[in-house]
C-alpha cells in the first residue's frame, strides 16, 4: 500500500513539472522586427509624399531607408534558417514573416529598376517634339529650368523608346474633341489648372492639369492642345515630371492611355442622324363646293 502511494506521489510530481518552451532564434526575432519596421517606415514615407508634409528629397530618403531595412530583414531571415537548422531552435514562422515582408517591399522597386535599365533616362514626353504644347499656367508651379522642352537629343531618345506616342487625329469638329478630352481628364480626377476651349477668335483649345502617380503621388504636369487639322481635329499632348531625370515610362503611358480613351469615346459616340425628308402630299383637286341646305 505504501509503495503504491509513493508511486502515485512521484507520478503527480512529474505531472507538475513546468513546461519549458522551445528556445527561439534571436536572429529570427530580429528578422520579423526589421520587416515590420521597414513596412511601417515605407507606409509613413508614402503618406509624407502624398500629403506634402516634407519635400521630395527627404521623403525619398525615408523610403530608401525602408528598403535598406527590408534588405536587412531578408538577410537575417536566411541567417535564421541556418541557425534553426543547425541548432534545432524555434522561430521558423518569424523568419518566414521577415522574409515575406522584406520581399514584398523590395518587389516593386526591383521591377522599377528593370524598367530603368530598359528605358531612356528622360522625363518630358510629347506627341509633337517639333512644337510641343507649352506649359503656361503650369510654368509657375514647375521648378526653375524645367519648363521648356529639353530639345532634339531627348526627342531622338523618345522616338526610339516610344514610337507609338504620336498625335491623335479625329474626323470630328474641334469643339467635340476638346469636350471629350476635358471630360476624360475630369474623370481621371487630375487637378485642372487651366482650360481654354476653342472659340471663333481662338481656334486652338488648351487644357493644363496636374496628374499624380498611383503609389507615391508624385506630381506630373500635363498640357493638351486641340487644334483643327483639315476637315478634322488634331490632339497633341505633353506630360512631364516635376522632379527627377527618369520617369520609368510613366509619362508615355499616361499620354498613350488618355489618347486611346479619347479615340474610343469619339468612336463610340453615335453620329446624329438626319430625319428623313417628308414627301410633299399631292395637291387636292378643287372640288365643287357643296351647298348646305339652308336651315329653317
Q: Which stretches of residues belong to each language-model region?
A:
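Ser/Thr-rich, low-complexity intrinsically disordered terminal regions
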Residues: 47-52, 82-94, 109-296
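Preference for short coil/turn "hinge" residues that link or interrupt alpha-helices
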Residues: 20-23, 77, 118, 161
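Membrane-embedded alpha-helical segments of integral membrane proteins
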Residues: 26-84
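Membrane-anchoring hydrophobic segments
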Residues: 2-43
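Feature targets compositionally biased, intrinsically disordered low-complexity regions
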Residues: 1-2, 231
